[in-house]
């Protein structure tokens, strides 16, 4: 039964029991600042359980997207190395909001598992909270599970109610006992039942947890029965799929086999190995392929839900996951962007269940590709530093990676700390995290000391307000009312001082309404002050932030205040076009579009708005056309101050939740009319040209566009044109023929790759025939240790398979050398694996050539860095195998 069918059957079963099927919520928690990402099925129902929200249903069932990476729940470092850790997983759940309780929850679970999924009853074990006699009796007396397979778990975490079988939302609030269902994978796997000393083994695996919200815990820790108990359950789709598909590891289920094959194709693995991986168990596959199969899900779904790679918060977690994937692809041989190529395969597997993934396919691939290109520009140099440090450590016998080096990798080459730690883990060394943290703290302190002086609006000022003249003039005379240095009022500022100047009159616009503050110059009789930013100290008091360039300034002096006209004009273009763009977005996408935030400065406009789906290329073009038509119309801009009621009657657009005074400024520009206190162009034609350069998501239901105008728009368009012309010149075609020519080249490349694979296979077969004659008899079996010139690892593997078939009973070591590195494959036929293990054999050879490796008893792989020692290492194989036989 495939994963998609299991998901569908789960939802259909509970729908037949009166449950409302509810779509998965976004991975970005809605209005819950306590969560970095959605990590459980109940997250979207939290307010329902707390009584803050009412739904038209009392029973629900979901298949919820979840991510555990970053924050309290972080499985990132284990992904790829264990059977069941994931960054992304699907949680199947059924929920009762004051409707049914323990009896129905337990019987529903048992019916689904044993009658719908047909699991053997004797394979299922159950745990209950030690004091939950009700659940124990339902399991043993009503369901009929033998008492020896129903285990009571007490307070096993050092405090009252601190138990694996007692769930609490927090220190106070809803809580209650839970019952967990385990599947016994069989005695061939080590481990004991839950509660036993061997419970950490992998034989008994939890597949379903049913939480019974029965109590409300007060601040004194007293449990009060809830008037309407509820049920919250969760069953990992990956785990139940492994059980139903008869495999032990999650990475062996159909979904991951497909994605592992996709990863192999993306990094250029030979197609023969891809097919073998698809058709066999994946527990022998390199952890790196598992990392890629896992991470493509987390990254794609996060991007589809509006997260974009960045340097903080959710964006930085996403960047860490992407870069970890890139590093593992690099380890597998990828030297250019590859990860984004897996997106179509993921959409084929999961797009039907999650339409938002299918709708955002192009955007997801583009974001991944851009992030890959950025990191591939630095990864090679970064890896050289890593390898150099590891080599020095090996020489010195050191097992701790230098924290300052780790910080250099982070700061200069974009290596997140956990990526460096991941590499070190493979070499069995650790990173000095304390030294890394210290280096990070030093950099932050230096940045604070050297950075631009920018103060929050908390200066101690109790004087007259500033009169603003900047709507109609860019120069004005003013007197200095106050000066500040290091946040303290002073009488004067001298050359080199960073400070804040308060004037009685100014043409400088102070940052407000998303528009950046003006910059420019204050010129007095005794000195010149460079204004780098203008911020409001109080509602009507403007602070001019900057540095004294020459001479000095003193309180009471007069100055000539001059705004940087070019910067102001660019900002005005970007602000005015934001109004036109807002109107156009509502025309194209619908009236639900509302402003959620904006930033307007001389370089660009950034506009956040309410919308649930990525904009299509056609929608972006349509918005651009509408705005540029308004620009060409060259309509005059009009601003009027009026009563708030009059502004509302005029149809002026207002921001939801914004507080306005009794009088407001209404700006009419083209067909747009909004409340706005910013600075704008005189006519729409002054904007020149408008071009959207970025569209993406920033939160659940919030999209972001970035756009440029005027000269910046012209430069952007010319740069895009230059790139196309550059490609067309390389291809020797006209620009409008580039796409067709590239498609033809790709077809040729694919044909050549197939031909190369065919020739390598033919070469392997030919070499295999020649090598058979070189095998010698050892203890009644054949032994072969040989070098294949020019063979890559897939060719070594293919040759190994052919040799094992021909030699029947044999131990074989094949080697090749390329770029100063040794590749080794060891193979042992099934009849000899009881005495000779391929993993031990390949390690014996690898250790002599400066490497190590491992694998299955019948097939193993290794590498080395000392090819000059290879002949002696291969010559020693016969004695080693003879001793084993």
Curated annotation (Swiss-Prot):
One of the record's GO cellular component terms: cytosol
Annotated catalysed reactions: tRNA(Ala) + L-alanine + ATP = L-alanyl-tRNA(Ala) + AMP + diphosphate
GO terms for biological process, alphabetical: alanyl-tRNA aminoacylation; negative regulation of DNA-templated transcription
Binding-site residues for Zn(2+), renumbered to this chain: 575, 579, 676, 680
SMART domains, per the entry: tRNA_SAD
Record-linked Pfam families: DHHA1, tRNA-synt_2c, tRNA_SAD
Gene Ontology molecular-function annotations: alanine-tRNA ligase activity; aminoacyl-tRNA deacylase activity; ATP binding; tRNA binding; zinc ion binding
Free-text comment on the cofactor: Binds 1 zinc ion per subunit.
Entry text on domains: Consists of three domains; the N-terminal catalytic domain, the editing domain and the C-terminal C-Ala domain. The editing domain removes incorrectly charged amino acids, while the C-Ala domain, along with tRNA(Ala), serves as a bridge to cooperatively bring together the editing and aminoacylation centers thus stimulating deacylation of misacylated tRNAs.
Protein name (Swiss-Prot/TrEMBL): Alanine--tRNA ligase
Species whose genome carries this gene: Azoarcus sp. (strain BH72)
Gene that encodes the chain: alaS
């Amino acid at each position: 039964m495939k994963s998609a069918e299991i998901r569908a059957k789960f939802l259909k079963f509970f729908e037949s029991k009166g449950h409302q099927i509810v779509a998965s919520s976004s991975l970005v928690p809605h209005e819950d600042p306590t969560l970095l990402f959605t990590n459980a099925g109940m997250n979207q129902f939290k307010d329902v359980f707390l009584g803050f929200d009412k739904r038209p249903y009392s029973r629900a069932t979901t298949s919820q997207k979840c991510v555990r990476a970053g924050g309290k729940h972080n499985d990132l470092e284990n992904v790829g190395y264990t059977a069941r850790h994931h960054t992304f997983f699907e949680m199947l759940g059924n929920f009762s909001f004051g409707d049914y309780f323990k009896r129905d929850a337990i019987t529903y679970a048992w019916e689904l598992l044993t009658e719908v999924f047909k699991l053997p009853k004797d394979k299922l074990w159950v745990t209950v909270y030690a004091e939950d006699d009700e659940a124990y009796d339902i399991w043993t007396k009503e369901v009929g599970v033998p008492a020896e397979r129903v285990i009571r778990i007490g307070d096993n975490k050092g405090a009252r109610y601190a138990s694996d079988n007692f769930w609490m939302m927090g220190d106070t609030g809803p809580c209650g006992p839970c019952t967990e269902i385990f599947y016994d994978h069989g005695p061939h796997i080590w481990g004991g039942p839950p509660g036993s000393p061997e419970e950490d083994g992998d034989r008994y695996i939890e597949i379903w947890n049913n939480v019974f919200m029965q109590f409300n815990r007060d601040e004194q820790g007293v449990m009060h029965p809830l008037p309407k108990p509820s049920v919250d359950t969760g069953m990992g789709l990956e785990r139940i799929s492994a059980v139903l598909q008869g495999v032990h590891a999650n990475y062996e289920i159909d979904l991951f086999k497909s994605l592992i094959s996709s990863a192999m194709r993306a990094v250029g693995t030979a197609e023969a190995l891809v097919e073998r991986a698809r058709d066999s168990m994946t527990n022998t596959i390199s952890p790196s392929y598992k990392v890629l199969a896992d991470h493509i899900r987390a990254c794609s779904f996060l991007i589809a839900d509006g997260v974009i790679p960045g340097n903080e918060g959710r964006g930085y977690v996403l960047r860490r996951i992407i870069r970890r994937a890139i590093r593992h692809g690099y380890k597998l041989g990828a030297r250019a962007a590859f990860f984004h190529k897996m997106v179509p395969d993921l959409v084929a597997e999961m797009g039907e269940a999650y339409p938002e993934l299918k709708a955002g396919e192009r955007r997801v691939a583009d974001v991944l590709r851009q992030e890959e290109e950025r990191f591939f520009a630095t990864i090679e140099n970064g890896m050289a530093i890593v390898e150099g440090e590891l080599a020095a450590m090996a020489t010195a016998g050191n097992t701790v990676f230098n924290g300052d080096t780790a910080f250099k990798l982070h700061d200069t080459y974009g290596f997140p700390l956990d990526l460096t730690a991941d590499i070190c883990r493979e070499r069995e060394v650790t990173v000095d995290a304390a030294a890394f943290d210290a280096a990070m703290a030093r950099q932050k302190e230096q940045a604070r000391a050297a950075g631009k002086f920018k103060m929050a609006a908390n200066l101690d000022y109790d004087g007259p307000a500033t009169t603003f003249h900047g709507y109609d003039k860019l120069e004005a005379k003013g007197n200095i009312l106050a000066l500040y240095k290091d946040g303290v009022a002073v009488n004067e500022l001298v050359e080199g001082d960073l400070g804040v100047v308060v004037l009685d009159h100014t043409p400088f616009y102070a940052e407000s309404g998303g528009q950046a503050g003006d910059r420019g110059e204050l010129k007095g009789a005794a000195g010149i002050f460079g204004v780098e930013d203008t911020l409001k100290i109080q509602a009507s008091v403007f602070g001019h932030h900057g540095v004294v360039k020459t001479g000095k300034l003193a309180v009471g002096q007069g100055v000539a205040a001059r705004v940087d006209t070019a910067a102001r004009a660019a900002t005005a273009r970007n602000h005015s076009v934001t109004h036109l763009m807002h109107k156009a977005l509502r025309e194209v996408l619908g009236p639900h579009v509302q402003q959620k935030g904006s930033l307007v400065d001389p370089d660009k406009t950034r506009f956040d708005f309410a919308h649930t789906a990525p904009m299509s290329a056609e929608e972006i073009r349509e918005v651009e056309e509408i705005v540029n038509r308004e620009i060409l119309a060259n309509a005059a801009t009009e601003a009027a101050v009026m009563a708030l009621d009059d502004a509302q009657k005029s149809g002026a657009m207002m921001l939801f939740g914004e507080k306005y005074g009794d009088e407001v400024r209404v700006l009419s520009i083209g067909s747009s009319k909004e409340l706005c206190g910013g600075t704008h162009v005189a006519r729409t034609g002054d904007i020149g040209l408008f071009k959207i350069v970025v569209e993406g998501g920033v939160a659940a239901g919030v999209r972001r566009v970035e756009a440029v105008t005027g000269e910046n728009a012209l430069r952007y368009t010319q740069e895009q044109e230059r790139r196309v012309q550059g490609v067309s010149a390389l291809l020797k075609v006209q620009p409008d023929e580039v796409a067709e020519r590239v498609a033809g080249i790709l077809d040729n490349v694919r044909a050549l790759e197939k031909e190369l694979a065919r020739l390598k296979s033919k070469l392997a077969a030919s070499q295999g025939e020649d090598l058979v004659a070189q095998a010698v008899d050892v203890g009644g079996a054949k032994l072969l240790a040989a070098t294949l010139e020019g063979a890559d690892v897939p060719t070594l593997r293919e040759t190994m398979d052919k040799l094992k078939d021909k030699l029947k009973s044999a131990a074989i070591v094949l080697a090749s050398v390329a770029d100063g590195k040794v590749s080794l494959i060891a193979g042992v036929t099934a009849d000899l694996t009881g005495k000779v293990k391929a993993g031990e054999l390949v390690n014996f050879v690898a250790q002599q050539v400066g490497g190590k490796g491992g694998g299955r008893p019948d097939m193993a792989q290794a590498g080395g860095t000392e090819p000059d020692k290879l002949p002696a290492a291969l010559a020693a194989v016969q004695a080693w195998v003879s001793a084993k036989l």
